[in-house]
């Protein structure tokens, strides 16, 4: 049995002093970003390794300002390039035409265009220089650009119809080479042999993120194979250009959510992702670090370029309540088909938590969360790759951030009244 020990006043004060210091340290640690605290996260995340929780009561003091610096509006060159017919009248536009944006060290801007299967090039002042590619199957031509990327001082574009990557010189813009890509080969994993697959993101010139799912979307309403009303899970792997899977499963995410309705005998459903519905989010940094998330949960997972899990970041938040009238008002008044869909479809009770994840050239995460504002606004968190908050700011939903480099944000902006889209560059100013 332990015996009590008598303490002098000096020793009591010494212990009390250190106890106070320890309490203060613990208080500070709990107020800042840290390891998961069971009281602030959902139960299913309690066993997730290396989980960092962003504490809402420890907002960073750094302020962020954006100064509009450049608007790309060379109408003679781009013509109807920004009029995105896939938006379906949605006020914040679609991205069907857009196949990525890259910026080189000299500030030249490269923009992929799926409609014309070309890459537009502008100098740092917004002057139109030229276009690369064009519709066709010859060297340097495309039939379906997935994305563009700068890697090893070259610009390359992946063509998902021809399964090949085309490389251009950053300086002269000359064609360098064309490489076949075999990501459509039967995978060397028994459990994935019969699963449809498609490349979804570029990691490097030889590595891709490829999705696999055990069933495709089936919109044949009234048949036994109809599944738009079901949740489909999608698995993601790192695959090289020879078609060999180079990773364990990176993540398993929920596929894009569909809402459906039958109106006057017509089966209606959304054809593309919408910000008020769940969708998988995948972002890859310039160095190949992979970030994944389901938009309906404020949890972002970080993976190495080989697919290995590193950590996860969780942002506790109350999700925005869904309001049918508010959603309908996001579409054009003459968009009868989507209005009918939204009037009659069963909608989720809440908006998703996230609308975007972007990685800047310094490896920082820019995470867009959906706010309670009546107008569609996003609250962006700027985080170190450790999860430490740097700054927050609010940004309109019609400004989609596509690239952050050299102290600038490059946004794809939709004119709400017309649906026309332009690329706008903003200078970033951070204080604090």
Name each model feature, range by range:
Residues 18-30:
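Bacterial N-terminal signal peptides
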